[in-house]
């Protein structure tokens, strides 16, 4: 009986030692994700992959913190310090802001990836298309930026530009993937505005179906710049891999896993090139600027980090909760964002998770210019 009792503490000690041996590299790895995200000095695609794993590393650090609090409190200091050092990054994923009252009527900006507007499945989605069109036209916003917006001059249901112009007389449209469409149709980035657009320019990124659209808009006595962008899509479909695992088809699951890693690698490389162009536009802007769109990357990624060096993020400054924007697997991510320059103050930011017409949710930010 005594021997059995003596073995139990030994077993517990061995388990505790193994967990501690796991805690040490975990904390070092988490610190590495911080270093890469703080400095942004390493531009290799592997750095992008490491940065993307930051929230998971922080979660594991939190679990280890709880464990050590109840096992050996002194050891809990290490994960606690690591989490404290990364507190600023936690704010990228969760916010607790409340709407700010303003004497000035804020300018409302919507951004929404509209998923091609069901252009490839019109017969099955007629009702959904009409509901989507009414929503994007009737929602009360001053400026609306859409990604994957579709228009076709020979299909009445897709006379979407003229439909939107009923309430938004000013617009700019840059078609993307022109080689995939005939002369009567186009899909790409569009900005609709209640206020005059005095300048527009845009570009499809090299080797990509994505791009940016820059517009200069005159509101009252002020000229403002709005950039609508969509970065390279990673093309990740996690549900394919998880379904293979559920079916115990581990060979195909491994193939899907390798495909995900390959897509991430390509995406990080392309995002670096694309964000170099976007950042140059931001730096050269003579006007207060708002940048919106589909980053196809999480807040711990390189693209988010590099734009955040130059602009504030609307979710962090005025949002609440987690702000997840993806309406498909893996769901619990935020890849659609709005950013603004120092001349602006964000007074409210929302993700409209009740609007489910697309595989993304719309984001809506409200802004006032300082001194107004």
Label every PLM stretch briefly.
Residues 114, 149, 231, 294-295, ...:
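Active-site metal-binding loops of divalent metal-dependent hydrolases
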Residues 15-30, 35-69, 77-80, 202, ...:
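Metal-dependent phosphoester-hydrolase catalytic domains
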Residues 101-110, 194-198, 208-253, 344, ...:
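Beta-strand-turn-beta hairpins that frame and shape the catalytic cleft
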Residues 111-129, 151-153, 235-267:
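Acidic/histidine-rich helix-loop elements
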Residues 1-13, 41:
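N-terminal Lys/Arg-rich, disordered targeting/topogenic segments
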Residues 72-94:
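Internal/C-terminal transmembrane anchor helices
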Residues 93-219:
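Membrane-embedded segments
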């Amino acid at each position: 009986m005594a021997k059995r009792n003596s073995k139990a503490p030994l077993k517990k000690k061995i388990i505790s030692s193994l967990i501690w041996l796991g805690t040490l590299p975990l904390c070092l790895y988490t610190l590495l994700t911080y270093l890469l995200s703080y400095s942004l000095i390493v531009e290799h695609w592997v750095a992008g992959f490491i940065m993307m794993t930051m929230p998971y590393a922080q979660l594991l650090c939190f679990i280890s913190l709880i464990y050590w609090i109840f096992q050996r409190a002194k050891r809990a200091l290490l994960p606690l310090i690591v989490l404290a050092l990364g507190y600023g990054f936690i704010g990228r994923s969760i916010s607790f802001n409340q709407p700010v009252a303003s004497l000035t009527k804020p300018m409302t900006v919507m951004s929404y990836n509209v998923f091609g507007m069901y252009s490839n499945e019109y017969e099955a989605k007629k009702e959904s298309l009409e509901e989507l069109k009414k929503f994007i036209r009737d929602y009360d916003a001053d400026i609306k930026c859409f990604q994957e917006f579709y228009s076709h001059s020979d299909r009445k249901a897709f006379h979407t530009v003229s439909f939107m112009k009923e309430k938004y007389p000013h617009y700019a449209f840059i078609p993307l993937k022109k080689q995939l469409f005939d002369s009567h149709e186009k899909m790409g980035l569009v900005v609709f505005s209640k206020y005059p657009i005095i300048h527009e320019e845009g570009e499809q990124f090299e080797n990509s179906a994505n791009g940016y659209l820059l517009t200069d808009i005159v509101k009252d006595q002020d000229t403002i710049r709005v950039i609508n962008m969509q970065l390279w899509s990673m093309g990740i479909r996690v549900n394919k891999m998880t379904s293979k695992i559920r079916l115990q088809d581990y060979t195909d699951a491994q193939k899907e896993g390798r495909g995900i890693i390959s897509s991430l690698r390509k995406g990080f490389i392309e995002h670096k090139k694309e964000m170099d162009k976007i950042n140059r536009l931001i730096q050269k802007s003579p006007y207060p600027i708002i940048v919106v769109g589909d980053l196809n990357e999480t807040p711990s990624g390189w693209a988010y980090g590099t734009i955040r060096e130059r602009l504030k993020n609307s979710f962090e400054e005025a949002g609440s909760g987690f702000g997840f924007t993806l309406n498909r697997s893996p769901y619990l991510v935020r890849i659609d964002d709005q950013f603004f320059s120092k001349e602006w103050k964000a007074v409210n930011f929302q993700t409209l998770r009740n609007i489910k017409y697309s595989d993304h949710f719309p984001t809506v930010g409200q802004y006032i210019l300082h001194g107004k």
